[in-house]
């Protein structure tokens, strides 16, 4: 999972992720927006889940982050619909709307993002 952190002309941090993980970048850009307290909450949840069968979820305005002890899923909230609403043969998966990755990989991106934000 490759990523890049940039600052726009106003100094706002933007995250770009490799193909297949774009929605993780959108989560940082739309939900985190340099809110390090949210990252603290996510890291604490990840540590609490380690070795357990439980899961944790944080719904945001545009994206929801879900994780268990091994995997993180970020999905666009617009994907919430009943299976009956899906047309025959249509797959709702869209790499811009859903992404899965390992917890350790995700926490590495969180740590790198935190370091980048603090370098102002």
Swiss-Prot record:
InterPro entries: UPF0231. NCBIfam families: PRK05248.1-1 (NF003574), PRK05248.1-3 (NF003576). Belongs to the UPF0231 family. This is UPF0231 protein YacL.
